[in-house]
Amino acid sequence: SDFQDVAAFLGAGGQRGPQRRILREGTYAINLVQFVVITEERVYSLPLSRQDEEIVRAMATFISERQGFRPVVIKDTDDQVGIVTVHDGPSLPQGEIIAPVVGDSAADEATYHNKFQDADRFLLAGGLRGRQLQVLVEGTYYINRLFATVEMIQKTIIEVGTVGVVVSYTGEVGEDLSGDEYR
């Protein structure tokens, strides 16, 4: 649904408040009695109370601060990856700091979230709130920034003639092989 069928929205358990699904470019016949649509250029709505207008304006500012009106674009020449932090869903288990990869198989239509572009499928796949193990690489991604934010970081480059030592913050607790002199 593109929010054009109010009865279908409500019949499918639609709830009040910001929606996980976003609208991409196009023309939509949306009932503005039921919905407010916030874009970079304007807010589409029927007249709102002063309080509701302030809430919508604050939300538009918040989305704008997260660059939420534009897709995430990562070019090969940027030498960057996108670190995703999800702001919805169940919390990580105690002691964990990075959420595992879920819903990454296009073969499973029910849970394939296509790199966080379908928030409902991400959550259906068991996705957790917090920083994600799965990163974004070259491509264009239409992600609801109320659902998830993306921090761009430089790719790691190990110069010729040098090495990089890797320390993992995920996985099972391993045996410390560094020796007593390291401590």
Q: Could you tell me what each predicted segment is?
A:
Residues 1-183:
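Interfacial loop/beta elements and low-complexity acidic/Ser/Thr-rich segments
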